[in-house]
């Protein structure tokens, strides 16, 4: 199941690709209705566990994210972790802009909450 949501001023671009299996979320995230925006993403990620297809690479490059979106990302990571529990390798790359301590701390917080994931927090230019 592939999914592509074009990014806007208020929402990130989301790409879930099946060959190779990857999830990419990048941009700002403060949608008017978090449930409407992230609902299809959460559903698609949860569906991955029903028919595992090998390693999953997750890449996030968030510029800004509000508290409601953080909760939605937590649910996405729950789905990603459930996929890992099916016996598949999962790698997560939380890409942080230089000098963005808030986004770096948020990435580290997610890393701590999901210790079984291969979760890396790093800077990009």
Residue ranges with predicted function:
Residues 30-50, 54-55:
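Short, well-structured hydrophobic secondary-structure segments
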Residues 2-39:
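STAS-typified acidic loop motif
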Residues 22, 56-57:
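Structural motif
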Residues 11-19, 45-51, 76-77:
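Short low-complexity stretches enriched in small and charged residues
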Residues 38-41, 57-110:
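Amphipathic alpha-helical interaction surfaces in cytosolic regulatory modules
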Residues 115-122:
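A glycine-rich helix N-cap at a beta->alpha junction
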